């Protein structure tokens, strides 16, 4: 899945003890990395929409891949991941669906 023409539909939880304010998932400016649980590779994403973040509660969100040179094929339905800002784990989630645009 090196082609970037897909959307990652996921359920995420942001940790209250890791951030002061909840991220805005709807303005197209929140671009953390996802790291598959048990792996080390950083997968850059751009959250494009989602429910309002309530710390420590699961919400739905959608993200786009951003790096053409990264293999995103590990992001399959059911894949669990951490949300990283720098070296800090600020949340976690799992993939609900991978929607191909083509």
What are the roles of these predicted feature ranges?
Residues 1-102:
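C-terminal effector/interaction modules appended to NTPase cores
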